[in-house]
Amino acid sequence: MLAPMTAAQREFDIVVYGATGFVGRLTADYLARAGGDVRIALAGRSPEKLLAVRETLGEAAQTWPILTADAASPSSLNDMAARTRVVITTVGPYSRYGLPLVAACAAAGTDYADLTGEAMFVRQSIDDYHKQAVDTGARIVHACGFDSIPSDMSVFALYRRAEQDGAGDLGDTNFVLRGFSGGVSGGTVASMIEVFRASSNDPNTRRMLEDPYTLTQDRGIEPDLGPQPDLPWRRGRDIAPELAGVWTTGFMMALYNTRIVRRSNALLDYAYGRRFRYAENMSVGSSVAAPVASAVATAANNGVVALGSRFFRFLPRRLVERIVPKPGTGPSEQTRERGYYRAETYTTTATGARYLATIAQQGDPGYKATSVMLGECGLALALDRDKLSDLHGVLTPAAAMGDALLARFPAAGITLETVRLS
C-alpha cells in the first residue's frame, strides 16, 4: 500500500468535479464559506462555465484554479485525480458517468466522495475497483448526501454510544423519517430512473437489487435473519413505544440506504453485530386519516417499485425526460432555505438496552443539506486524516470517516444526538 498522502505531494486538497451543476454549485459555495485555507479547484467540461460559477462564489474562491475534465476523456480524469488528495463529484447519473472517475481515483490513490443513490453502480465499483483502491490507499466513498448520510451516521452514532456504555451489539434497528420538507433533486430522480431501467432490462440485476445484502463484501458469510422487506407497513408502536399513535409507510430511499448501512456493518467487521437487523420507514402522522394514508402510501410505493423494476424499459425515454426534474436543476434559494429533515433511529441491543439517535438539519434535503454533507465529507477526507478509519477501498461514509463526521457535524449545522431510553 502507498504511504498516506501528505499536503506536499498533491497540488490540491479538494477538487469539486461537476461544479457547474446545481448541487455542484451549492457544494462549491459551501466550501468557499467553510473551507478556510483548504486548496480547492473546480473541474468540469467547460472552463467558461466554471469561470462563471467561480465569479458567483465568495472572495476566497476567486483564486481557485479551473481544471478541464470530462468523463469521456479518461486521460483528463487521470490527470485531475493525480493532482489532488480528494475528488468530490456531483456528475451523475453515476452509472453513466461515474466509473471512469472511480477508476482514476483508485489508480492514483486519491480519495473520492459522491452522491450516488444507484446500488448497481456501487456494486460495480466494488467489483471492479475495491481491491485496487485497497492496494493504492484510496478511499472511494459513495452515498455522501441525503442518500445515505442520515441513515448511515445515525446507526454509527448508536453503535458508538452502545459501545461506550458496554451495552452489547445492536439488534433490531429502525430509522423513521419524522419530518421532511423539500423536493427530490433531479439527480436523485435520474438515479432512480437508471435503477429502474437496469432492473427492467435484466432479471439478474433485479434479483440483486432485491437482495438486502447486495452491497456487502462477502454475501456468503452474511447471517440469515429472515425476510427484511424494503417498504414495510408498520404502526409506530411496533417500532418503539415512543411512537405509539404514529403510523408509518415505507420510505422509498430505504431500497438504497439499507444496503449502505449493512455494508458499513460488514466493512467494520460486523461491529454493529451479527444479529443486526435494519429497516426504514417514514411517518405519516397520528391523525384520524393516518392509518388509511399509511396503507395507501405503502401499497403505492410497493406498486411503483414492482412495476418500475419490471416494465420501465417500455416507457419512451423522451416521455420520461419530459415529466421528471432534469439533473442540474433545482428550487429557489428561499425554498432551499425553508426545507429541513428530522429522523429518529431506534435500536435495542443484545443486553436489552434501548437507544434513540435523532438527526436533524435545516435546508432542503436534496439540495442545500446534501451540499453541506458532501462538502463536509470532502473536508473530512482532506483534513481529518487522524480521525479516519484505517480502511481503504470502496467504502461507506460511516466505515471511512464515521468519527470524523461526528466531530464535524455540530459546526456544520447537523445535529446528531443519542439518548438511552431504557
Predicted regions and their residues:
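A short, Lys/Arg-enriched amphipathic alpha-helix followed by its capping loop at the start of a domain
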Residues: 30-37, 268-270
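Glycine-/Pro-rich loop/turn segments that contact NAD(P) or position catalytic residues
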Residues: 93-213, 263
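Short, conserved SAM-binding/catalytic segment
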Residues: 53-62
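Conserved Rossmann-fold cofactor-binding substructure of NAD(P)-dependent oxidoreductases
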Residues: 67-86, 90-96
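C-terminal catalytic/substrate-binding lobe primarily of soluble NAD(P)-dependent oxidoreductases
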Residues: 2-7, 160-422
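N-terminal Rossmann NAD(P)H-binding glycine-rich loop of SDR-like oxidoreductase domains
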Residues: 12-33
